[in-house]
Amino acid sequence: MATSIPMNTNMKMPTQTLNEATDAFVLQRRKRDGGTKPLNYWGFRNETDALTDVLLGPADHLRHIATSSLSRKTLRDHPADIRVAQAQHQELLAAYVHFGVRVHWHSPQPELPMQVYARDSSVMTPYGAIITAMANWWRRGENYAALRTYERLGIPLYDMVTAGTFEGGDFNVIEDACVLIGCGAGRTQEEGARQVEGWFKKEGWETRLAFFDEYYVHIDLMVVPIAHQLTAVCLACTEPGIVTWLKAKGHEIIDVPFEDTINLGCNFMSLGRGRVIVPKSSRVLSQRLRAHGFEVAEIDMSEISKTGGGIHCMAQALRRDPLA
């Protein structure tokens, strides 16, 4: 099923309603030996339950700079039209609003031109947010801005990455208490990945590290969960051992072609309850999702993705509700 998203320049955000047992901001609530209790309201068990709250970054100060091999190529050949890119981001916002997702924002800062990619500066977990450690100097300020955002929202921090660089696009909750951690060296170093892995092992989670060439930037370029035991994977560029691991866990794989993947076609957002936001250019994935009965909202991301990321890169899930 295709979904048409109505554009409304006077969109109103869904009103945020918290339950009575709210959570309070603290800088670290992780218990060093494990056993950290899940938050009362915020967080999620997996990346496929119904999305109720999402964190986005503003595109107000977006610039097209050479942040990766992907953005470097488009900058050289066909630089992004920033006004069109910003309009496409508004279409993405409209999709979340259309599906009733409460949208929260980082505060816009002119010194942070890549702030629109809200996935990377933090990670949400059942236990609180993790402030990551960005690899590139021009993005490190996003970590400090993210800390302020969580303080403003009243969301506690689980911890902060200190052992090495680590970016949120490399934290992939495959299913309940199971995380796939990417390590491409260019953005997430093994030291940072091992630190985060150690935390979740102590919480009793199953963990798996995925090593890949830094060309692919983050693991969410090639592996993204769709629904319970249904995962989109680019088989052409994903380590076979990861695919075998997923299949052994009972996951059905939807293959995304390599050409689509390097154009961010596997970088989409599952909203849960059979709804998915997908880049318009990812036609093969859209067709295969519809064949599985999903409601697919296609958003044109052709200009904004030139700056280095896709739909999944632009969103940090803050809360998913398994009962919604």
Model-derived features: positions:
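The feature marks the mature, well-folded catalytic cores of soluble enzymes
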Residues: A2-A324
